[in-house]
Amino acid sequence: MRRRSKKIKTENNSNPETSEERNKFDEIPHDLVIEILERLPLKSVARFLTVSKLWATTIRSPDFRKSYRGGSSSEPRTLIVSDLNFKEPNPKLHFFRPSISSPSFLSSLTCPFTYPRHEEYYYHHVNGLISVGYGTDQIVINPTTGKFITLPRPKTRRKLVISFFGYDSVSDQYKVLCMTERLRGHPEEASSQHQVYTLGAKQKSWKMINCSIPHRPWSWNAVCINGVVYYIAKTGEGMFRRCLMRFDLKSDNLDLCTILPEEIQTSLHDYFLINYKGKVAIPNQPNFYTYDVWVMNQEGGKIEWLKNITFTIKPRKGFVRYLFVTGTTHTGEFILAPTSYTDEFYVFHYNPDMNSFRKIRVQAPGVKFSFAQKASVVFSDHSLLRLDNLHIRGSTHTATGEFILAPRFYSDDLNVIHFNPDTNSFRSTKVEVYEDYE
């Protein structure tokens, strides 16, 4: 007997009205979409990743990440790294984000480093990530999650490695620049073995680059503006002339930018580079309470240094004795912070237009500022939004309706994020893998 095959009729259960409503989202003018998203808190922005591909692309774009303020244009975006006990192995790092309304604790992590006395830490912050260089060990940290990746060791036998960190928004690439020096006793000798590591590149190794300018880094910090990393160095005969070096992330070119003005050459204070309204600036301190801000102007192809701002902090109640200018906010305020703290920790914002100060206290649940003279590092203009590294995976949601978001890259641990649109909440889930994976 011949059997007939049973045909199963399938029906399209998609709701045409729902599809039409979703299409209406894409009809909203792009500028209006940006304006709406910029006024929303982070969790709401993450929720709108699921509206459409156009909205997801917009949210992950570098321009939106740069302009996003977390729902408030007046909210400070300072990032503070504290509890840096360099004299102990495997120091614990705490990341804080001070806020006018509710100061927040972001994360903590234990650095996988020991502490030989001849090595130093180098911290650099750019576009929401932090690089920490410690001798030949280099890691890159996401302070929002407390996760980090370990980079391969540079190609060198030397122990003293100085590193800098940069980001190019055009190519959406992070790069680490490092160079080596002899351990001690050779202050007049230039650095050598200049190498570059590109995060996310297929070739996970350091690339040697040429530098025709003999120089030796003088300041531990750097500033990255428009895909160029700037740092202060010594050059010339005997390494006595102080200059500004620049590293172009697009071309991997390292060269001399300009010589520092004489007023800064003779300063006895440490140099600290900041980004002031898109320009390289150096806050100089003639004395404990006075600050001169020198800004580098490159208009017309000619480089000149202008002393744009001078302000003084009068000793007053509630101010610690010695503050450093560590950066500026997106609203143009200068961030002043101590290098250490005791029972409490504060940062200060100075508004040059209003000639006014405001004091922001840093608090963290479960973390006490109870030990005297703990070291700290304060980064300005921290970008908390790193949604470009999260993507909806698999069937996009769980059986309970939660959306699954996973990172593009991982190191030792693999975690996925579950977002519940009903409760507007996130939870992190560690994925256990029992075989090798790439």
From Swiss-Prot:
This is Putative F-box protein At5g15660. One of its GO terms (biological process) is defense response by callose deposition. The lineage of its organism: Eukaryota, Viridiplantae, Streptophyta, Embryophyta, Tracheophyta. Residues 22-68 form the F-box domain. SMART domains: FBOX. It comes from Arabidopsis thaliana (Mouse-ear cress). Residues 1-24 are annotated as: Disordered. It comes from the Eukaryota. InterPro entries: F-box-assoc_dom_typ3 (IPR013187), F-box-assoc_interact_dom (IPR017451), F-box-like_dom_sf (IPR036047), F-box_dom (IPR001810), Gal_Oxase/kelch_b-propeller (IPR011043). It holds the Pfam family F-box.
